[in-house]
């Protein structure tokens, strides 16, 4: 559990932004989850969220950020996320 800071994207954050967000208490930064949750809420749906942290923030890794890294990590996480949601949803 932690604090998720949502941005509109579509660009990765800069190291300066990450530093500021960290000082503000953000544990994770992302471009998805919140917009989808807002639309679902506006439609009257109950909303919950589970996120996959797909990459280290700008300035936190030895290599530059890339969409390929995000996609690869998401693919690797898919089986575990599927299992988690399959077990969780019947309990809601």
Language-model region placement:
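Glycine-rich phosphate- or other oxyanion-binding loops that anchor nucleotides, phosphorylated ligands
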Residues: 1-52, 56-62, 67-92
């Amino acid at each position: 559990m932690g604090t998720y800071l949502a941005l509109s994207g579509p660009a990765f954050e800069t190291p300066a932004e990450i530093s500021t967000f960290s000082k503000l208490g953000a544990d994770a930064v992302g471009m998805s989850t919140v917009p989808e949750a807002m639309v679902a809420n506006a439609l009257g749906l109950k909303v919950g969220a589970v996120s996959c942290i797909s990459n280290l923030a700008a300035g936190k890794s030895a290599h530059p950020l890339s969409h390929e890294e995000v996609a690869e990590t998401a693919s690797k996480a898919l089986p575990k996320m599927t299992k988690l949601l399959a077990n969780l949803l019947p309990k809601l």
